[in-house]
Amino acid sequence: MDKTSLKPGSTIGIIGGGQLGRMLAMAAARFGYETIILEPQAGCPAAQVANRQIVAAYDDPKALAELAAASDVITYEFENVPVSAADKLAETALVLPPPAALEISQDRFTEKQFLNESGIETAPWRLVDDEETLIAALGALGGRGILKIRRLGYDGKGQVRLASLDETQACNAFAAINKAPAILEGFVEFEREVSVIAARDRSGNVAIFDLAENVHKDGILATSTVPAAISVQTAEAARTAAEKLLHALDYVGVLGLEFFVLKDGTLLANEFAPRVHNSGHWTEAACAISQFEQHIRAVAGLPLGNTDRHSDCVMENLIGDDIEKVPAILCEKNAVLHLYGKKEARAGRKIGHVTRIKPRTI
């Protein structure tokens, strides 16, 4: 550890109190760190395992001042933290990953632009401000695409598929997203979806986990399988892109980068998340060091850990009524269960995950 590394007993502030914040707090505790959560919902999943919670809005000035004063470093568990709040914290505290990464990722336009400018290929896309630009974008992209709101869309929300040049359908689609600023992403025939979980420390060192192959259902991640059924060359291209992105952002922490894989093995970046990622939960059961520990290591100024995988695995999200599967899962021989402490199992709500491991093959 260098002189700037956090010593045991230091405090890590975490903005956001969901399951990602919970698992970050648990990882921090293993290193002897205390955690303080800023989250408006009292008794949130992260607060259940943290030392303290500030119950306030993410942009509450008094709460931000309290968090900054109490923390040796501040991180966040989701990408829709108000950038103004992160910038305010950064005036008096160390905020990692840097707020600039938040700002870029919060807007699909700036995200796609940054990826392309960093030499990372994406599906073709066009900016959409109104019906006229949407119709023009459809024409430019061959009459097919996915209309996506620029901000606050996640788990498939704020998206409409378009499959023709019909202007009425285009106008209806724009109305369906409440005429919000958007992009139109060209439709691509992909063979599979994969993601890479990568980390960069304060000195610029990079460590990357094996790629996961992801399956989504209703816009929400259903399973992540490792190893992904891709070539060595495709996997290496994804790792290279992730490393390129980490350096371009001057990033510190863990980042998730998602790709479409075309039939010929070509990779098209879909999006990145400047945080620990749902498709990296498998690392908790199949690696010596999880993505959560890796993130804590990075932001605390500790050396990055070994990302080697000791097992093959399939991570399955438990959503809503899947809570009823828990008794059976507990009887499975090689299933690692993690529940998030949520008080209500609503439809579409992630309440936990299970990772089924088996001996490593490749």
From Swiss-Prot:
Q: Which Pfam families match?
A: ATP-grasp (PF02222), PurK_C (PF17769), RS_preATP-grasp-like (PF22660)
This entry's Enzyme Commission designation comes to 6.3.4.18
Protein residues bound to ATP:
108, 148, 153-159, 185-188, 193, 216, 270-271
An example GO biological process term is:
'de novo' IMP biosynthetic process
Q: Which residues form the ATP-grasp domain?
A: 112-300
- One cellular component GO annotation, for this chain's record? cytosol
Q: Which SUPFAM superfamilies match?
A: Glutathione synthetase ATP-binding domain-like, PreATP-grasp domain, Rudiment single hybrid motif
Keywords (A to Z) from UniProt = ATP-binding, Ligase, Nucleotide-binding, Purine biosynthesis
Q: What pathway annotation does it carry?
A: Purine metabolism; IMP biosynthesis via de novo pathway; 5-amino-1-(5-phospho-D-ribosyl)imidazole-4-carboxylate from 5-amino-1-(5-phospho-D-ribosyl)imidazole (N5-CAIR route): step 1/2
Disulfide links within the chain = none
Recorded catalytic reaction(s): these are:
5-amino-1-(5-phospho-beta-D-ribosyl)imidazole + hydrogencarbonate + ATP = 5-carboxyamino-1-(5-phospho-D-ribosyl)imidazole + ADP + phosphate + 2 H(+)
Is Amino-acid biosynthesis given among the entry's keywords?
Answer: no
Q: What class of enzyme is it?
A: ligase
GO MF terms listed in the record are: 5-(carboxyamino)imidazole ribonucleotide synthase activity; ATP binding; metal ion binding; phosphoribosylaminoimidazole carboxylase activity
> What does the subunit section of this Swiss-Prot or TrEMBL entry state?
Homodimer.
The role this protein plays is:
Catalyzes the ATP-dependent conversion of 5-aminoimidazole ribonucleotide (AIR) and HCO(3)(-) to N5-carboxyaminoimidazole ribonucleotide (N5-CAIR).
Q: Which HAMAP family match?
A: PurK
The text of the family note is:
Belongs to the PurK/PurT family.
Q: What name does the UniProt record give this protein? A: N5-carboxyaminoimidazole ribonucleotide synthase
